[in-house]
């Protein structure tokens, strides 16, 4: 295992400036994956960085069920945690990083494969309900309902509902426009028709949330 301080700065993205810089990384590729993810999370507007589990509970206490945020994990074995308000209170779900991808912690008794993603934002978006302008559709334009996922906590089986992120900062107008465009680009063909500078700008944050 190697730590962030072992990696040279040359040719790499901006070093981590959150509590994650004290974490241990298994490889340079994992370090780069986390650096790229942090950069996108910092632009997302709902990354709360060093907020603790207790502080996340306070932040979400007055919010409706389905409100969520991303923060740094207090567990040294993990990088990020998804804190979400449920009907049973706030639940903290570890986001696991393994084999160059992220996944949400699952019930160890389950034999079902866990969805994996190369970015935390894509992971979060996967568990959110489909919007009218995106998502797979049935004939006639109706959206296919997404599969229901469950949280297993303290013996409870709770449906995982991610409705809206809790904002940690005000997004720029440019970023809001980028998210809107990302939500409407549902095919590679549409992306290739865009001018190169716009494609590059969208690639820097390729999520609709």
Curated annotation (Swiss-Prot):
Signal peptide: none annotated. One of its GO terms (biological process) is negative regulation of receptor signaling pathway via JAK-STAT. Residues 161-208 form the SOCS box domain. GO terms for molecular function: cytokine receptor binding. Phosphorylated on tyrosine residues after stimulation by the cytokines, IL-2, EPO or IGF1. Pfam families: SH2 (PF00017). Disulfide bonds: none annotated. Residues 22-33 are annotated as: Kinase inhibitory region (KIR). SMART domains: SH2, SOCS, SOCS_box. Keywords: Growth regulation, Phosphoprotein, SH2 domain, Signal transduction inhibitor, Ubl conjugation pathway. Pathway: Protein modification; protein ubiquitination. Residues 34-45 are annotated as: Extended SH2 subdomain (ESS). Interacts with multiple activated proteins of the tyrosine kinase signaling pathway including IGF1 receptor, insulin receptor and EPO receptor. Binding to JAK is mediated through the KIR and SH2 domains to a phosphorylated tyrosine residue within the JAK JH1 domain. Binds specific activated tyrosine residues of the leptin, EPO and gp130 receptors. SOCS family proteins form part of a classical negative feedback system that regulates cytokine signal transduction. SOCS3 is involved in negative regulation of cytokines that signal through the JAK/STAT pathway. Inhibits cytokine signal transduction by binding to tyrosine kinase receptors including IL6ST/gp130, LIF, erythropoietin, insulin, IL12, GCSF and leptin receptors. Binding to JAK2 inhibits its kinase activity and regulates IL6 signaling. Suppresses fetal liver erythropoiesis. Regulates onset and maintenance of allergic responses mediated by T-helper type 2 cells. The ESS and SH2 domains are required for JAK phosphotyrosine binding. Further interaction with the KIR domain is necessary for signal and kinase inhibition. The SOCS box domain mediates the interaction with the Elongin BC complex, an adapter module in different E3 ubiquitin ligase complexes. This is Suppressor of cytokine signaling 3. It comes from Gallus gallus.
